[in-house]
Amino acid sequence: MAAKAYGYSGVAMLRITMIIASRAASVHSYHRPPARNSVFLSVPQDSDPSSPQQVHISLVGNDKMRISWITDDLVQSTVEYGTTAGFKPGTSATGNYSTYEYATYLSGYIYDVIIGPLQPSTTYFYRCGGSSQEYNFKTPPPQFPIKFAVVGDLGQTEWTQSTLDHISKSNYDMLILLGDLSYADFDQPKWDSFGRLVEPLASQRPWMVTQGNHEVEKMPIVHKTPFTAYNARWKMPYAESGSGSNLYYSFQVAGVHVIMLGSYTDFSSGSDQYQWLQADLKKVDRKQTPWLFVIIHAPWYNSNTAHQGEKESVDMKASMEDLIFGAHADIVFAGHVHAYERFTRVYKDQANNCGPLYINIGDGGNREGLASKYKYPQPSISEYREASFGHGELEVVNSTHAQWSWHRNDDDEAVVWDQVWVQSLAANTGCSA
């Protein structure tokens, strides 16, 4: 099916339409590679128990970065950093550490240190907990263009590794993960394995994540508190955005405002999350911040047969769709369904030029496999759908236009299979923001 080039016309639209139309026509002849094995990365037996592992970073405000890591033995909760490799100890920051218990499992020491202020578009080198091991990351740009890698339902299989390899070859500035991270599903050492698996990427670019159903991990009698591992291991800048929960927050970068919502915490009208969303949307000045993206886990629009009628989708949509539409959000990303689907701009199940695009991309590589069955006929609001593993890239070129592309893990190569230009609703004179 040909994709629309939202906001572009002429040669650009013709080129994109022809590319997508030709590829869509070839989908039926595509022979999908077989499923991949699960991956479990353990710590080498001869490793130093004080060495940092599972290192990952995330944005905090406009000019700070949270550094998180884990050790088996307790070390100092400090990070040394500078702008040259092999730097001498100088600038440093101190933070906190914690542990958590889950049934018979006791986590390692989890460290949380915020460093900054930092300069934009700058490479920093850093060391964790007094270790000599050096890492590096690059801060996002202060303005457009900026590129986001977008992935959902990642898991830890050989398909996951393929997805990560493809992302690593992209010149992206930060990654957004739409929930369902480790697929530990109560088996806590799998959280450690996941942290080791993603460290090569997550230690070099900020990863901003939200939770999915696989992060709940609530068990009657044995463990009654939900999201224990997720909240301990993946701290996000919720307090900085006025949220009272790590399960929903927002951040702003280079003229883009991103709202990360929680599909598995109370979203009803009058709930803390609902009231926070109302307040957060009111703070967004679309003249200063022309782009608005919303992240959920359970999709509000979905023509796959998987996960139909779930309350996390149906009830959350009923509660919050009016808020999102009224704020003129540009794109709503979701995961959960293990396939890819892109909708046109939608509001209340109908095409609407002032509604957000809806994109489902829960195809990162999880162990449960793909959701390959779709409802027929294909709804008119669904513009492209395919059950294949992959990831997305969103390059916000300027204040008015962005390019979205979906990269399929086709025969172990990252293939661009769906691509569309998007115009910011803030730049659409027919939609008053």
Placement of each model-derived feature along the sequence:
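An acidic-aromatic substrate-binding cleft motif
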Residues: 132-185
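Active-site neighborhood of phospho(di)ester-bond hydrolases with catalytic His/Asp-centered motifs
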Residues: 150-152, 174-180, 206-213, 262, ...
